[in-house]
Structures are given as structure tokens and as C-alpha cells.
Amino acid sequence: MKKILEVKNIEKYYGNKSNLTKAIDNINFDVNKGEFVGIMGASGSGKTTLLNCISTIDRVTAGHIIINGEDITKLKGNNLNKFRREELGFIFQDFNLLDTLTAYENIALALTIQKVKANEIDKRVNEIAGKLGIKEILKKYPYQVSGGQKQRIASARAIITNPK
């Protein structure tokens, strides 16, 4: 099996020298292509911090995170931004949909930023919306749809760019 994620000896500290808090302590694991992984633990155990580090929202204090052979802990600036755009898809717990955009516009946003042609955006949004059963709500705003529909909009937005 091909490793798509390697987490090696990662640690994450918050604060300064006089008041350090260790959020993650020497975590190691691998994920192979096709595997599904659940992260479980008590409140405050570092689950969100771990996922924020893997998703490049936060940086590790020590250790390495390797995604598809690339050590993301070494990426910075434009290289990190490019990696996020092309390799990752994010689904946030609270959806992070933009209230001033319709469901269609929220889903299409990443493609618009990547300067994909309008007809290709329309094709891809409608295709994913059809697969997720949300075609009928594409013209609605986030405040007009249910929590489950918001989750599907967020899921569509995460996969619209075909992240690896």
C-alpha cells in the first residue's frame, strides 16, 4: 500500500519559554491510500491541534508531516499556498461558508480563485452537487439551508478542486 500521510515525532507547543503548554507530544502514525482514520480523544487532548498541523493551518514545533512524499513542515510562502490549493481539501466542523454567497458560489469559489473557465466551473459544480443531492439548493444562501445541507455544501467545496 502507498503511504499518503506520515506523521513523524510531531510536537506542538503554545506560549513562550516562561509559560509553555504542550498540545501534542511525540505523535507518530501512517495512513495508506484507501484507509479511513478516526481521531478520538478527550476534550483538550490535542485532536484539533493535530488536524490543524496536518492541514497546514498551524505549524508543528518539532517533527515532520509528509503528505504524498512531500514534507509539508518545510514548505513556506507561495509553495505552501500552492500545496494547500492543489493537494488538500478542507471540511470544517462549523462549515465556514460565506453567508453573502449562494451555495453555488461557495462551492465554486476555489475554482474561481484558480481562474478556471466559467463553463468548466458550472459543469463541475453541477456534477458534484448532483452526486451530493444538493442541486436544488444551489441558489440558496447558507442561512436558508439545514445543517446537513451546509455540511454537503462544505464537502462539495472541499472536493471541487480534486485534491489528492
Could you tell me what each predicted segment is?
Residues 2-5, 10-164:
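ABC family nucleotide-binding domain
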